[in-house]
């Protein structure tokens, strides 16, 4: 279930309010390809033998939302590593925006019952679904101003789970890493959907070659650390971290629905013929 599946605005408002009622849209409007301030991530695993049917329905849903100019956007990704699954990357500037989108979507489904039926058909082909809300932490991100998601073809998402009360240790480790960092990544704090504290590190990639480049960049960044920083980071990893899992996802524009401004960043890729 993506945001398209949220048809109960009261429940949605409760979820967002419980997540973090203090996040609101402020400041100048960012560029269309900038990492969003708020993420709704939905991970789906399909029933055996139903992946192709779900994919067909997702492509058709994307086309219908384009046709009706529904102002709700998402990027659909498929797992390259880890278990087979889909991941929906729904951007927003605030939790309030997600709240409004949920109410808007309920109205769209009411006016277009064929879309609601199509969504139901998708959900009938799912074995499981998990929804996560996360908010960008600018002070932990680095190089985020260089990120342009319109050019991305893959996303590497690292999930970092911490022991309770060790958020400051994670922040310290990220701050120490920033000293010699050359890569670009956006860091998000999970506020609903996973055990807390959990952070997400999102890194856009333009090709699979960037995966190899990223490994080399990470190696150089680690070599560039001062000895004291390296030892402190290792200590934090041992004492504060519960788990780290990194996976690669491929973007599928034919199953995505992005804004015209976003698509203009690379129309040959995002606008399907």
What are these regions (language model features)?
Residues 1-8:
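N-terminal secretory signal peptides that target proteins for export/translocation
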Residues 4, 18, 22-24:
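Residue-level detector of intrinsically disordered, flexible termini
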Residues 8-19:
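Bacterial N-terminal signal peptides
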Residues 22-273:
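Short S/T/G/P-rich N-terminal loop/turn motif that feeds into the first structured element of a domain
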């Amino acid at each position: 279930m993506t945001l398209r599946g949220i048809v109960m605005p009261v429940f949605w408002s409760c979820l967002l309010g419980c997540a973090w009622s203090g996040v609101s849209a402020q400041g100048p409007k960012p560029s269309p390809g900038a990492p969003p301030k708020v993420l709704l991530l939905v991970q789906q695993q399909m029933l055996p033998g139903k992946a192709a049917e779900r994919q067909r329905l997702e492509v058709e849903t994307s086309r219908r939302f384009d046709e009706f100019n529904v102002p709700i956007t998402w990027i659909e990704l498929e797992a390259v590593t880890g278990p087979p699954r889909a991941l929906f990357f729904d951007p927003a500037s605030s939790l309030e925006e997600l709240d409004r989108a949920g109410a808007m979507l309920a109205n769209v489904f009411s006016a277009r019952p064929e879309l609601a039926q199509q969504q139901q058909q998708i959900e009938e082909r799912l074995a499981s679904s998990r929804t996560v809300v996360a908010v960008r932490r600018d002070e932990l991100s680095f190089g985020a101003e260089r990120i342009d998601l319109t050019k991305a073809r893959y996303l590497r998402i690292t999930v970092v789970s911490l022991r309770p009360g060790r958020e400051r240790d994670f922040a310290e480790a990220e701050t120490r890493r920033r000293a010699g960092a050359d890569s670009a990544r956006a860091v998000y704090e999970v506020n609903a959907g996973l055990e807390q504290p959990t952070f997400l590190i999102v890194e856009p990639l333009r090709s699979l070659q960037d995966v190899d480049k990223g490994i080399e960049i990470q190696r150089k960044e680690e070599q560039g650390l001062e000895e004291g920083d390296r030892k402190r980071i290792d200590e934090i990893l041992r004492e504060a971290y519960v788990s780290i899992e990194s996976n690669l996802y491929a973007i599928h524009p034919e199953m995505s629905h992005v804004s015209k401004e976003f698509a203009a960043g690379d129309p040959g890729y995002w606008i399907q013929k």
